[in-house]
Amino acid sequence: MSMPQAILTDIEGTTSSLSFVKEVLFPYARRALPDFVREHREHPDVMPWLDQVANETGTAFSEEALVATLQTWIDTDSKHTALKALQGMIWASGYQNGDFTTHLYPDAVQRLRAWHAANVPLYVYSSGSVPAQQLFFRHSHAGDLSGLFSGWFDTKIGGKRESTSYQRIAQHIGIAPAGIVFLSDVIEELNAAAQIGLNTVLIDRRDDYPTPRHLKDTDRHLHLDSFAQLPF
């Protein structure tokens, strides 16, 4: 596989450990939700998302009901756009207060910097909101890496297991699918990207997946343990 025209990467389980997201970020947002909703429910950046949750679920517009719904979604790792937007706002305070910094795998940091230095456009596609993605890379233990990226995509462009989402991304960045490599730890996402012609790489880290995965469709994708093994 030669150097691509652009690289699109997932975050959780790909550039960063699953445990950081599930054991640090998710619990932090869960704990902060009651106070956040109480203090910001009328804020113009918050109210539309709470309204959406109430309308879609038939939940009475009360703080307790909304918090209970959102916490359940966190517990089940829901990718709902409203939840991701609200989580991002909560995490912003955590980053600003120095409550945590982002974990990034050293091999990912090294390759991201090298690709940027080689003028390869880098893009992020994650279920987390774009502001949350930017915070994630801005407040990492390796420093502010947000400037390495040319663009950011979240579920507003479509679900990560839907091939049309990758078509929209390719159109947005102006590069044919065959010129783009997508890096992810989720086989269903890679299948969707490959369906419209993206080159795909399954990142199968032992820290996140102790047993190498040899499942249906695994062999459709370049299958590596880390960014260090990438041939470009």
Swiss-Prot record:
Q: So what does this thing catalyse?
A: 5-methylsulfanyl-2,3-dioxopentyl phosphate + H2O = 1,2-dihydroxy-5-(methylsulfanyl)pent-1-en-3-one + phosphate
GO BP annotation list: L-methionine salvage from methylthioadenosine
The cofactor binding remark recorded in the entry reads: Binds 1 Mg(2+) ion per subunit.
Q: Which cofactor does it need?
A: Mg(2+)
Q: What class of enzyme is it?
A: hydrolase
Its EC number is 3.1.3.77
The pathway is: Amino-acid biosynthesis; L-methionine biosynthesis via salvage pathway; L-methionine from S-methyl-5-thio-alpha-D-ribose 1-phosphate: step 3/6; Amino-acid biosynthesis; L-methionine biosynthesis via salvage pathway; L-methionine from S-methyl-5-thio-alpha-D-ribose 1-phosphate: step 4/6
Keywords assigned: Amino-acid biosynthesis, Hydrolase, Magnesium, Metal-binding, Methionine biosynthesis
Q: Name one GO molecular function term.
A: acireductone synthase activity
| InterPro entries assigned to the protein according to its UniProt record, in alphabetical order | Enolase-ppase_E1, HAD-like_sf, HAD-SF_hydro_IA, HAD_sf
The family database entries (SUPFAM superfamilies) matched by this protein are listed as: HAD-like
Membrane-traversing stretches: none
> NCBIfam families, per this entry?
enolase-ppase (TIGR01691), HAD-SF-IA-v1 (TIGR01549)
What family is this protein classified in?
Belongs to the HAD-like hydrolase superfamily. MasA/MtnC family.
Description of how the protein assembles with itself and partners: Monomer.
Q: What is this protein for, i.e. what is its function? A: Bifunctional enzyme that catalyzes the enolization of 2,3-diketo-5-methylthiopentyl-1-phosphate (DK-MTP-1-P) into the intermediate 2-hydroxy-3-keto-5-methylthiopentenyl-1-phosphate (HK-MTPenyl-1-P), which is then dephosphorylated to form the acireductone 1,2-dihydroxy-3-keto-5-methylthiopentene (DHK-MTPene).
Protein name as it appears in the record: Enolase-phosphatase E1
- Native species of this protein? Xylella fastidiosa (strain M12)
